[in-house]
Amino acid sequence: MAHSIWHEKIKSFLPEHYYGRINHFLDEAYASGLVYPPRENVFKALQVTPLEETKVLILGQDPYHGPKQAQGLSFSVPEEISAPPSLINILKELADDIGPRDHHDLSTWASQGVLLLNACLTVPAGQANGHAGLIWEPFTDAVIKVLNEKDSPVVFILWGAYARKKKAFITNPKHHIIESPHPSPLSSYRGFFGSKPFSRTNAILEKEGMTGVDWLK
């Protein structure tokens, strides 16, 4: 399911047998219709960014619901897929903040300790938030609670009202929160543009004696 250390830590914050409930939900969802991302990528964020290496969290809401977009990492799409509007705005802010990045696949961020997590890990094709409130929120809230327990600092990047509600789980004074409106076209001009989350994150990490993220990689 997830990287083994993640698995054990997350489990401690969930009701008994919750993993079984998740597997049952996935069996039914994928058997009954088209669901994104592909099932083998549902837990990709936790598989490619081990707990012990996680130093940044970028929290999304749910996967992209169009064909071939979702790959299990928040805001990221495969290289050959056109960037959706929110990702276009993220890359625009990155260009203004640090420099231009031409590719849409954010896997290289994940491999540097940036956990690209969605609050819901699946979505029915064409139905934004179609799986919201059914199974995922206790699981992904548990991920945030696990990160809150880390001794080493984590930078939590929270974009939009939904993500910012998760501040309630971030109580460890060692950690840092960067928040702004969401990068979607509806809210990007209300404070996302100009918020400089990437340079601010690196400044925090370097002040803590940690290596910054190569956001342009």
Curated annotation (Swiss-Prot):
Disulfide bonds: none annotated. The active site is at 62 (proton acceptor). It is found in: Cytoplasm. GO terms for cellular component: cytoplasm. Its EC number is 3.2.2.27. It catalyses: Hydrolyzes single-stranded DNA or mismatched double-stranded DNA and polynucleotides, releasing free uracil. GO terms for molecular function: uracil DNA N-glycosylase activity. Keywords: Cytoplasm, DNA damage, DNA repair, Hydrolase. SUPFAM superfamilies: Uracil-DNA glycosylase-like. CDD domains: UDG-F1-like. One of its GO terms (biological process) is base-excision repair, AP site formation via deaminated base removal. The keyword Transcription regulation does not apply. Pfam families: UDG (PF03167). Excises uracil residues from the DNA which can arise as a result of misincorporation of dUMP residues by DNA polymerase or due to deamination of cytosine. Belongs to the uracil-DNA glycosylase (UDG) superfamily. UNG family. This is Uracil-DNA glycosylase.
